[in-house]
């Protein structure tokens, strides 16, 4: 099975954040491609507030406006006007919980709503089964040169962001998976900026001949610890967390 992994070390992020203005942050790891721009909006007029709803379970498998098949387990959304493949940082203004979603559908058309979220995204921000939730939306840009980055990592089976070969050991937790490489990078970057003690990897496998990108926590020493981490991420709202003996 072909696969690739890379790591964005938490300690490196913390050092950078202490010394660099986040609004100007544009750091390139060992010159080969990963542009780490901050997840703030790119312009003042690209911040929106309004009501968020979520899709009913019955939409599973239906075609979205851009031709994809809708999945309750993905982190996509419907917007009336934003371009397809726009990435949005969604913040629940009541509890400040955040996730990153991608526009792939049109709607909602009710006046009091500006976005429809998947069940997965709604669970993560704590809005599932809470009706219309007031949210802030910020357009965020994926890292630059991701095509070059993906090709670079295809040269090695397992690699970290400093260009070193990684040999994972122990148990692995797959938090979430997506077909979209940019989406995996953005969500990994957001998680790494949080106060979690884990380091996050993006792993690539092929499923039915197409790449599938997993956000991973690696090198978990015991099954007991892995079970606890799986439970932790499920309580965070992730619906398909998997514990693996090896990725």
Residue ranges and their predicted role:
Residues 4-29:
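Bacterial N-terminal signal peptides that target proteins for export
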Residues 42-172, 177-186, 190, 231, ...:
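Secreted/periplasmic proteins
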Residues 179-247:
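Extracytoplasmic
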